[in-house]
Every structure is written in structure tokens, then in C-alpha cells.
């Protein structure tokens, strides 16, 4: 088992996702510092910051589709390294920007590149490892990957923002040297030889059963991005509404949450192997997330340390990201697997936009605490229902195609 878990495929996928998360988190951390350095101030820091985030998200949504289709048509390995190469170049270029236009272009290109990494890596790992070890493989990928956020925080604190981007680009380019030792998935090669139609993204929407399977695979991840995108991102505002004693910064809340995610991804992956079930583990983590979210809204007049610990616990509770992507990939045949594995995580990331939209509406009507709780209740309820509708995939033989 040890040899399988530390095969070149698993190591490259894990390190690729590590650099992927580093870049995703780095922008959030250096946003203000970098925008001030190119001459922005005041309200522009927020307005242009939102623009850059939207450009990155647009790139990720587009990239998820592009890389997914290419992953099923051209191969998992080509896409894995193609995505690493693209976001590494974008990161390096980002260190040279001096205008908001150039910054936005770099974030858009980086978003496209970042979109392909996780899906291609997970697809390659679950197709290469024996079925009894698949969960362990994705556990390693996610656990190592999430620690990229910790490195991003460290680098941003000790280096200039331009240097931080150069480091991210350099780390990605270093990974390309491992390409010579990684081989394509045998399942993909078998399907390729048969000349079967592959990567037909539209086919996910033309068959009712397949569409709802795809939709439910995505929606079980809603609580993850509700917690990260709302409760953690807007933690200073929630802390003020809860009369938390002591200063609360979004940066520290994010780091606390991601530290919890490291343990959550490891724990959920390990439990899924011990229980021999994906659904039971996601159910357990959803129940825990419901409890932690309810507790979050009851943190009246606590110290900032207790608040940060709750952020850590929340990160652990929604740390089923690896299982989420694994379930999505295992639901579909070899000719659509990379398409699903690449689009599902990026589409669920994209739900931050409608979640934030409804959060703002609910806040206007009910206040930040009640409004936030209502949105959370809806997201978690949808996730429970979607999980119920999905089939268990732990013992599933993945060597098949979608007709």
C-alpha cells in the first residue's frame, strides 16, 4: 500500500494541488498590499479586488470545462502538466504587473490554469490505484494540497508580494521536471484505442438521469463553499455582530479554517477507507458541519481565540473536499470522468457568487446573523438531499464507459 500511495502519479498530483492552493490563497492574502503597490487606494481596493476575484473565477469556470474535455480526449497526464505550466507562467507574470488591466489578465489566465489541476490529478490517481486504495490516494492529494495555504500565508508574511508570486510560479515549473516519470492511465489508453467518443460535455445535459447525477455530485459540496465563502471570508463582520472580544481578521480566520481542512481531508479520506463507504463519511461530516455552523452563530461575547478555534473546527467539518471530488469522478465512466472531475469542483467554487448574492439579500432583510443562518440552512439541506440521491461508489469498478 505504501508503494502505491507514494507512486509518482500520487506525488505529482499532490504537489500540483499544493501549488494550486498556494496560488488560490496567495491572491486573497496579498490583494491589498499588491493593489496599493500599483497605485490604488480607498474604495478602489475593494472594487478592483472584487474585479480580480471575478476574473479569476471566470477563468476557473471556463478552464474547468476546457481542461475536463481535453482530459478525456487527450489524456490525464497532458492536462495535469498543461494546467501546471499555464498557471505557473501566469503566476510569474503576475509578479511583474504594474496596472490593474495586466493584473486582471494574469488572474484570468491563472484561473484557467488552476481549474485543471485537481480534476486531472484525482482522475489519474483513482484510475491507477487499486479500488481498495483509491480513497487513500485522494486523501494524500487533498491533505498535501491544502497545506499550500499555510505556505502561502508564511511566504506572504516574510516576502514582498511580487516575490511571493515568483515563488509560486517557480514551484509549478519545478514540478514539470517530474513529467518524464509519470505514465498515462491504462483505463484511458484502453478507451482511446477503441475510438470511443470522449469528453462530450454536452452529453451531461442531454440525458435526464446523467444530468441529475452530475448535479447532485456538485451540490453535495455546497456547505464547503458556504462556510469558506461566507462564514470565514466575512468573519470580521460576523465577529462584530457577535460581540467577539478582541480583533478578528479574515486572514487569521482563513488560516485557521485551512489548518482544519488539512485534518478534515485526512480524516475523511481515512474514514472512507475504514468504513468502506464514501456516502457514510460525507453524511457524518455534513452532520458535524451542521453542528459547528449552529455553534458559530452562538459565539456571543467569546474571545477571538475561541472564535478562531471554531473556524478551525469548521474547516475540519467541511474537510470532505477530496471525497467530494472522488465521488464525482467515480460516478461516471472513463470517457467522461475527467470532464466531471474537472468541472464539478470549479462549478461548486462558482456557487460562491449566487450564495453571496442571496446572503446579501437575506442580510438586508434579516440582518447578518439571521440572514447568514438562513442561507446556511438552505445550502446544507440541499447537500443532504443530493447525497441521498447519489449511489455509493467505494466498491465500484471504474473500467467502463458512459453510453
Predicted regions and their residues:
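Cytoplasmic membrane-interface "Motif A"-like loop-to-helix N-cap segments
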Residues: 73-83, 132, 273-286
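Extracellular/periplasmic helix-loop-helix junction of adjacent transmembrane segments
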Residues: 30-62
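Conserved MFS/SLC helix-loop-helix module at the cytosolic interface between two early adjacent transmembrane helices
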Residues: 62-98
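Cytoplasmic helix-loop-helix junction between adjacent transmembrane helices
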Residues: 106-143
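Extracytoplasmic gate region of multi-pass secondary transporters
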Residues: 28, 210-265, 352-356
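Helix-breaking motifs and short loop linkers at transmembrane-helix boundaries and internal kinks
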Residues: 75, 96-102, 130, 276, ...
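Helix-loop-helix hairpin linking two adjacent transmembrane segments in secondary transporters
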Residues: 141-180
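Helix-to-loop junctions at the C-terminal end of transmembrane segments
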Residues: 64-75, 265-277
Amino acid at each position: 500500500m505504501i508503494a502505491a500511495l507514494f507512486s509518482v502519479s500520487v506525488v505529482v498530483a499532490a504537489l500540483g494541488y499544493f501549488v494550486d492552493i498556494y496560488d488560490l490563497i496567495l491572491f486573497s492574502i496579498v490583494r491589498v498590499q499588491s493593489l496599493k503597490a500599483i497605485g490604488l487606494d480607498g474604495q478602489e481596493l475593494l472594487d478592483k479586488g472584487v474585479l480580480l476575484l471575478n476574473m479569476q473565477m471566470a477563468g476557473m469556470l471556463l478552464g474547468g470545462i476546457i481542461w475536463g474535455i481535453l482530459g478525456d480526449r487527450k489524456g490525464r497526464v497532458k492536462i495535469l502538466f498543461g494546467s501546471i505550466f499555464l498557471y505557473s507562467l501566469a503566476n510569474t507574470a503576475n509578479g511583474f504587473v504594474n496596472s490593474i488591466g495586466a493584473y486582471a489578465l494574469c488572474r484570468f489566465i491563472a484561473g484557467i490554469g488552476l481549474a485543471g489541476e485537481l480534476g486531472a490529478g484525482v482522475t489519474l490517481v483513482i484510475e491507477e490505484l487499486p479500488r481498495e486504495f483509491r480513497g487513500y490516494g485522494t486523501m494524500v492529494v487533498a491533505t498535501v494540497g491544502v497545506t499550500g495555504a499555510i505556505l502561502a500565508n508564511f511566504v506572504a508574511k516574510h516576502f514582498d508580494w511580487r516575490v511571493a508570486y515568483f515563488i509560486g510560479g517557480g514551484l509549478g515549473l519545478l514540478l514539470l521536471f517530474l513529467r518524464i516519470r509519470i505514465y498515462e492511465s491504462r483505463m484511458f489508453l484502453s478507451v482511446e484505442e477503441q475510438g470511443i467518443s470522449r469528453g462530450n460535455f454536452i452529453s451531461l445535459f442531454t440525458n435526464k438521469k446523467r444530468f441529475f447525477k452530475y448535479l447532485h455530485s456538485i451540490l453535495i459540496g455546497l456547505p464547503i463553499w458556504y462556510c469558506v465563502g461566507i462564514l470565514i471570508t466575512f468573519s470580521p463582520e460576523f465577529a462584530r455582530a457577535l460581540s467577539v472580544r478582541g480583533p478578528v481578521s479574515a486572514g487569521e480566520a482563513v488560516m485557521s479554517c485551512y489548518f482544519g481542512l488539512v485534518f478534515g481531508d485526512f480524516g475523511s479520506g481515512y474514514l472512507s477507507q475504514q468504513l468502506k463507504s464514501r456516502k457514510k463519511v460525507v453524511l457524518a461530516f455534513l452532520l458535524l458541519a451542521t453542528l459547528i455552523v449552529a455553534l458559530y452563530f452562538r459565539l456571543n461575547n467569546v474571545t477571538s481565540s475561541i472564535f478562531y478555534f471554531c473556524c478551525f473546527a469548521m474547516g475540519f467539518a467541511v474537510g470532505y473536499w477530496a471525497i467530494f471530488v472522488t465521488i464525482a469522478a467515480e460516478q461516471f465512466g472513463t470517457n467522461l470522468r475527467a470532464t466531471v472531475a474537472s468541472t464539478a469542483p470549479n462549478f461548486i467554487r462558482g456557487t460562491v457568487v449566487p450564495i453571496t448574492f442571496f446572503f446579501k439579500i437575506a442580510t438586508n432583510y434579516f440582518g447578518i446573523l439571521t440572514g447568514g443562518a438562513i442561507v446556511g440552512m438552505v445550502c446544507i439541506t440541499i447537500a443532504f438531499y443530493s447525497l441521498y440521491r447519489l449511489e455509493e461508489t467505494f466498491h465500484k469498478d471504474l473500467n467502463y464507459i458512459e453510453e
